[in-house]
Amino acid sequence: MPEPTFHELAQLPPPVLRQLIRRGDYTGHTSGLGQRHLQANLVILQKSWADEFLRFCALNPRACPLLDVSEPGSPHFARLGADIDVRSDLPRYRVHRRGQEPVEVSDIGTFWEADFVAFAIGCSFSFEQALLDAGIGLRHLELGRNVAMYRSSIATRPSGRLAGPTVVSMRPLKAAEAIRAIQVTSRFPMTHGAPLHLGDPALIGIRDLARPDYGDPVPLAADEIPLFWACGVTPQAVLAEVQPELYISHAPGHMLVSDRLYDEL
């Protein structure tokens, strides 16, 4: 049976898409998939870090809008889907160990520990369908790429040991589209809401748009301005500063596609 095209993947309902991912039949990015369904960033920490991280999310709701938290040891997000298993239902994960480079895998079952707590954090991929419905084209989708993401100079509010930079995702738009995009995305605070910044990237510490820290470069036309939204990769940048002994995250751009609609929250 031939592999499904990306267009065919985009038409699949989330439970079917997750089954495909669970079997290891798709390991690519999820931008443009799930259509109107919420996508979630993933952070998995040992229980000793959970309360601190929960407070960090509460202090930084633009970057870390919390959609669900698992019980210790449970790999399930009951609020997001009946059959979700965070050990296998994302296309790619990063396993982070102190002092080592992250390892990317497509299943984390062998790494799972009894005291793990999983956090689902809202993702801007969720509001992309609303932008498309408003007639706003998205360059990274047109090019079949992941979105471009950057470590900014915008500091997060610290929580105990957790502090560091806000990561932002960038989408280039014309001025009229930018105004409409702000109006549209401000309706969805649980998927990062309105942009944190638009215009000169140097003002938020980004030197070169052609060299994103995560994701793929997305070209900017002469008549466009870059818009920057808070991004759920922020926890990875912050945790890299403090280096817990072990934690697991999604690989940037490779999200959990849930059964919840983005406009239900």
UniProtKB/Swiss-Prot annotation:
Top-rank taxon, per record = Bacteria
- A Pfam family annotated for this chain is D-Glu_cyclase
Give the family, as the similarity comment puts it: Belongs to the D-glutamate cyclase family.
Provide the E.C. number(s) assigned to this enzyme: 4.2.1.-
**Name the UniProt record assigns to this protein:** Putative hydro-lyase PLES_32121
Q: What GO molecular function annotations does the UniProt record carry, in alphabetical order?
A: lyase activity
Q: Which UniProt keywords apply?
A: Lyase
What are the boundaries of the signal sequence? Answer: none
Concerning InterPro entries, the annotation shows: D-Glu_cyclase, Putative_hydro-lyase, UPF0317
User: What organism is listed for this UniProt entry?
Assistant: Pseudomonas aeruginosa (strain LESB58)
Which Gene3D superfamilies does this chain map to?
PSTPO5379-like, PSTPO5379-like domain
Instruction: Say if the entry is tagged with keyword Lyase.
Output: yes
